[in-house]
């Protein structure tokens, strides 16, 4: 089995300074960290709070705060990390995690894994998920409970179940496992069980397992092969975990309390202002000096905004996200609440007809426009700033392209449902007949409202995933604007022509007369006759486009209109008198 290596070479991380009392633009969290890790071993990252252990783990995973500066290199098997291969080479589970209230534990784990590994079969995903829930984490009995109805410790285990399921699916292929405090909030017995599982997994899968821990008990500590102890963003020790106390002894630092107090001694030693830190202040300064001498020359820092964005979505992942979102919105009644507006609007029109005895198609069209504007200002689903979308996209579970496409799918389906209810009510009360079909405008309003809402939210939050895509798209549009200006103007003109001019409103005789008068007035003779012929054909083509497009839209209407199958005359498209645009 091939051996894998993970190398950190002078890794440096500066993040935007949040300290308002400081004039420094950046705060350094990792300072020239160099370390080598080998497969088949479990490495514990330890240190006091703020020492940089979690930040180092996140940096290895590529989770760098926006606007940060980075330096150094992170190599896997001697090569820079490949973003496309990251989901299949790395597994990352963080300390805080997140929950999705309306999903069950089983759904929470399942949708995460299938989005992360779309090529895996559903059967195999469920098999490994069952093994984790039932045998490893002991939460099989709550698998059908909603996430919001279980305890904090159970939510912690549900988050772990996602990472552990992925680990089992990629056993033998996974190169690096990153876990941020997986044993926190767990009882000692389960924590020890997980420690032993990670040690065994590293051996049989030949993976590099990196785990942050705060203050483990002696038994859990003994399950770790090696230790990286950090202080103030710097490496203090990297080597066998059992030898750390001996290492400190060689530097003149001794624990007089015995082996059973080693953990308390270590954290007292590196807590600023404590009795032990004052006692061994000079020795600690000497250790830090020696470690600084190992650092390589610091290279130019890069900004974290230099990130490529993939504009091609994974269709399977997008559909899974859309399905999950529809389930969530149905269970939290968001879909039901959103139906109130079209129902109210339809009933308002019905009331108006019977009170004022007057009604026009324009009133329905105005109501449709009002509904579309309402949906733009009151988005639902994935477009409504869902926290878990940010969390999952930050973890590279999917990209911005999948977010956009899944948003389009889920919100479009729900919007079509709303419009169907709207039309169903006014049709039932006789406000419209089967000769009035609005499919073209429904599609335009639905897609226009959905896309507009996404753009508005992207502009409002430029540092969000959607915001970055929007900004990148705008840059590309400006770069291509010169080449596309003519084509865009022509397309806009054709669209306006199709939308505004009804079919048959311009008789063929008038078109012929217009062409003849136009070219006669320009004095086109002799050498300009070719121009006259070409120009006449162009105008004829423009006048023909609305008919072609309307024929295509009629086919769509026959396929998708909710009342189509209840009306016999639609079976003959040539005889139908439906007008998709008014």
From Swiss-Prot:
UniProt xrefs under Gene3D superfamilies: P-loop containing nucleotide triphosphate hydrolases (3.40.50.300)
Domain ABC transmembrane type-2: 316-519
Family to which the UniProt record says this protein belongs: Belongs to the ABC transporter superfamily.
InterPro entries, sorted: AAA+_ATPase, ABC_transporter-like_ATP-bd, ABC_transporter-like_CS, ABCG_transporters, P-loop_NTPase
Keyword field: ATP-binding, Membrane, Nucleotide-binding, Transmembrane, Transmembrane helix, Transport
A cellular component term, taken from the record's GO annotations: membrane
Subcellular location: Membrane
Superkingdom of origin: Eukaryota
Pfam families: ABC_tran (PF00005)
Topology with respect to the bilayer: Multi-pass membrane protein
PROSITE patterns: ABC_TRANSPORTER_1, ABC_TRANSPORTER_2
Coiled-coil parts of chain: none
Name of this chain's protein: ABC transporter-like protein ECU11_1340
Transmembrane segments: 335-355, 359-378, 412-432, 436-456, 482-502, 551-571
UniProt: ATP binding residues: 47-54
Molecular function terms, GO-annotated: ATP binding; ATP hydrolysis activity; ATPase-coupled transmembrane transporter activity
Residue ranges of every copy of the ABC transporter domain listed in the record: 15-257
Keyword Coiled coil assigned: no
């Amino acid at each position: 089995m091939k051996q894998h290596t993970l190398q950190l070479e002078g890794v440096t991380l500066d993040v935007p300074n949040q300290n308002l009392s400081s004039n420094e633009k950046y705060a350094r969290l990792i300072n020239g960290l160099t370390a080598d890790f080998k497969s088949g071993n479990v490495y514990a990252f330890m240190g006091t709070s703020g020492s940089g252990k979690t930040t180092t783990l996140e940096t290895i995973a590529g989770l760098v705060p926006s606007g940060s500066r980075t330096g150094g290199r992170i190599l896997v098997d001697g090569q820079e990390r490949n973003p496309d291969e990251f989901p299949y080479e790395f597994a990352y589970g963080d300390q805080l995690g997140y929950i999705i209230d309306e999903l069950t534990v089983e759904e929470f784990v399942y949708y995460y894994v299938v989005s992360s590994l779309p090529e895996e079969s559903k059967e195999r995903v469920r098999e490994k998920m069952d093994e984790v829930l039932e045998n490893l984490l002991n939460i099989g009995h709550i698998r059908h409970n909603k996430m919001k109805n279980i305890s904090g410790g159970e939510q912690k285990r549900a988050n772990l179940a996602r990472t552990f399921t992925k680990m089992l699916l990629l056993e033998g292929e996974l190169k690096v496992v990153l876990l941020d405090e997986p044993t926190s909030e767990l009882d000692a017995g389960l924590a020890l069980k997980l420690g032993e599982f990670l040690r065994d997994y590293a051996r049989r899968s030949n993976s590099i397992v990196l785990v942050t821990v705060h203050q483990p008990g002696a038994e859990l500590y003994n399950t770790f092969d090696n230790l990286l102890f950090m202080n103030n963003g710097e490496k203090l020790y990297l080597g066998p975990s059992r030898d750390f106390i001996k290492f400190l002894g060689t530097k003149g630092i001794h624990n007089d309390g015995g082996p059973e107090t080693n953990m308390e001694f270590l954290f007292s030693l590196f807590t600023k202002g404590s009795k032990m830190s004052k006692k061994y202040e000079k020795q600690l300064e000497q250790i830090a000096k020696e470690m600084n001498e190992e650092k390589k020359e610091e290279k130019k820092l890069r900004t974290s905004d230099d990130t490529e964005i993939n504009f091609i979505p994974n269709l399977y992942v997008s559909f899974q996200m859309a399905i999950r979102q529809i389930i969530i919105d149905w269970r939290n009644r968001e879909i039901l609440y959103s139906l109130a507006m079209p129902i109210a609007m339809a009933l308002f029109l019905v009331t108006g007809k019977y009170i004022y005895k007057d009604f026009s198609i324009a009133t329905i069209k105005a109501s449709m426009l009002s509904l579309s504007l309402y949906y733009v200002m009151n988005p639902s689903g994935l477009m409504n700033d869902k926290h878990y979308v940010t969390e999952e996209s930050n973890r590279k579970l999917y990209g911005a392209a999948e977010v956009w496409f899944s948003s389009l799918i889920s919100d479009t389906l729900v919007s079509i449902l709303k419009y169907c209810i709207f039309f169903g009510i006014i049709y039932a009360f006789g406000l419209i007949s089967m000769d009035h079909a609005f499919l073209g405008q429904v599609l335009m309003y639905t897609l226009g409202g959905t896309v507009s809402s996404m753009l508005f939210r992207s502009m409002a939050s430029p540092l969000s995933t959607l915001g970055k895509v929007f900004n990148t798209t705008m840059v590309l549009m400006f770069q291509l604007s010169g080449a596309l200006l003519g084509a865009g103007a022509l397309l806009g003109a054709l669209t306006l022509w199709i939308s505004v001019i009804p079919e048959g409103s311009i008789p063929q005789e008038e078109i012929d007369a217009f062409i003849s008068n136009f070219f006669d007035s320009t004095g086109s003779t002799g050498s300009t006759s070719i121009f006259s012929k070409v120009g006449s054909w162009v105008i004829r083509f423009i006048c023909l486009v609305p008919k072609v497009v309307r024929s295509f839209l009629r086919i769509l209407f026959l396929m998708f209109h909710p009342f189509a199958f209840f009306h016999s005359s639609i079976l003959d498209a040539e005889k139908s008198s439906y007008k998709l645009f008014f």
